Amino acid sequence: MKLTRHNGRSGKHGTYNPRHNDRRFDVENSEHIDAERARQNVYWDCYRGFTTHEFRENPEQPDFSFEEIERMYYYEHYFDHVEAQNARNEKTRHTERNRTVEDLLKNNKTCPEESIYQIGTIGESVPPDTLFSIVNEFYEEFERLFGSHIHILDWALHLDEGTPHIHERHVFDCENRYGELCPQQEKALEELGIPLPNPEKPKGRNNNRKQTFDAVCRTILFDIARRHGLHLDQEPSYGGRDYLEKQDYILMKQKEQLAAQEQKLEELKLDRKS
């Protein structure tokens, strides 16, 4: 069996819309979706955590679509940047460059990136709870390593199509030179210490930090799958292991420094008492 993680932001009809992921359309008339099994899907978003079909049907619970969740997140975190950039455009008399938060959500450079996780095919897969456990552990590790600059906005476990799979959407961000938080992928990855695949060569389409980041994510996923007893077909993932080992080394050094500082403080306290 294969474990796959595919990423993208847009297709021939423009940027991907999260309505497909949280089933905000008439599933009864969709050929590839089993409407009855759709009630078993599991959803998660960054504001409410886990939700289910039953949660949506409860009139006492606030119901927000993934589209609304992403809009709220972008307004909360990037509105100040949009306003400040528009003000700078007015100063330089280039108001044609003005943008809105909605524009950030529609532009394929600043909109959320979508990842699809799947193990196996229609003929051979793993139980949904196994996929759920593996990907949930992956998200915890993802947050630990990248959470300062990459934010998971929402995800859905689909059990209503041929093979169980998960659609997840995230945004890369960091501060620009004006100190404003804004969506920017390459700069966010640089801030996280993600190296170029070939550091000695110039950055470009075939040599960028996103390639290393994706390799790191694949390495983490396969490590977690192995812990669950799965031995999956794996293509070489160059750079992923090196980055993780480097991060573990940095963390170990930080712990050693903290322990040394705490010991020094204890010694100072003892000196004062004596």
Q: Where are the regions that the model predicts?
A:
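N-terminal nicking endonuclease/strand-transfer module with a His-rich metal-binding environment
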Residues: 1-272
